[in-house]
Amino acid sequence: MNVSVVTERRTPAYSSLAAGELNGLVARALLTEARLTPKPGLVDIRNSGAHRDMDLAAFERSTTAIAPWMEKFFIMGNNTAALAAENVLVMLRPLGMACENDMLQATNGVNTHRGAIFAFGLLSAAIGRLIARGEPLEQNRICDQVARLSRNIVAHELSAKKAGKLTKSETHFQCYGLSGARGEAESGFRTVRTQALPVFNRVVQEHDDTHLALLQTLLHLMAWNDDTNLVSRGGLEGLYYVQQQAQKLLWQGGVLVEGGIEAMQSLDDELILRNLSPGGSADLLAVTWFLSHFPAGSLYPE
């Protein structure tokens, strides 16, 4: 089956970035991920994946609603750059809640991008801080700022014993040790920097094909990311199933070998039957594409 895809080439690396430009770059990251096809269990051009309450049009409306908020995260990060990073998170939360409200209005109450709002809100604030400090916009510096903004977020929000029923995120952490999006942010997007970006860059360099690079990167994320979206839908069994199937495809060459795209489509069909959607990995894929537009920089920025 042939499917139409968006195969936008990466723009030259950004040495600086205006707040308004940031809105556009985040929107392109979200739309590039949403339109990438085929994505097992996820909304794409081919189908709605394992989701019965959303489709590609909903993701496009959601992107239009939330992208303008990135400028506000940027400005907050820029205006508070003199403060210790860990003291800024509380100031970002109201922006995140308002952004999420606009998303829900655009999608008639469907959560299309909550994880992406969290990730890109932090990234936008981090970029604002770096520009205010006169520091270069580099992948490792941006992610280091995200880690500083998110310091102790797992301990504060997931570890503490509370009265009443645990949230899904608290259950995932306290029962299984899975820290989800908060843990990834607190690590400075370690999974993206150590796994996803190297794969993406290698495939782009060797094949000059952003579409293939994104699909191969998604497979790597599905294979190794402890995606709590999968745990919510299928328990640990669902997570392990997706990881094992993605690893199997990678051992066979992934989408870089003959029949690889068809194998992704078959896995898509299987995950739909099992009601499994690796939404956390999809968010990290969008983050990967976004960060690829900046130079890597030194591994341990000052």
Swiss-Prot record:
UniProt entry tagged with the keyword ATP-binding: yes
Annotated InterPro entries: CitG (IPR002736), TriPribosyl-deP-CoA_syn_CitG (IPR017551)
One GO term of the biological process aspect: prosthetic group biosynthetic process
Catalysed reaction, written as an equation: 3'-dephospho-CoA + ATP = 2'-(5''-triphospho-alpha-D-ribosyl)-3'-dephospho-CoA + adenine
Signal peptide: none
GO molecular function: ATP binding; triphosphoribosyl-dephospho-CoA synthase activity
Entry EC no(s): 2.4.2.52
Gene3D superfamilies with a match to the protein in the record: Triphosphoribosyl-dephospho-CoA protein
The keyword Transferase appears for this protein: yes
Keywords linked to the UniProt accession: ATP-binding, Nucleotide-binding, Transferase
Family named by the database record: Belongs to the CitG/MdcB family.
Full protein name: Probable 2-(5''-triphosphoribosyl)-3'-dephosphocoenzyme-A synthase
Organism, scientific name: Salmonella gallinarum (strain 287/91 / NCTC 13346)
Gene that this polypeptide is encoded by: citG
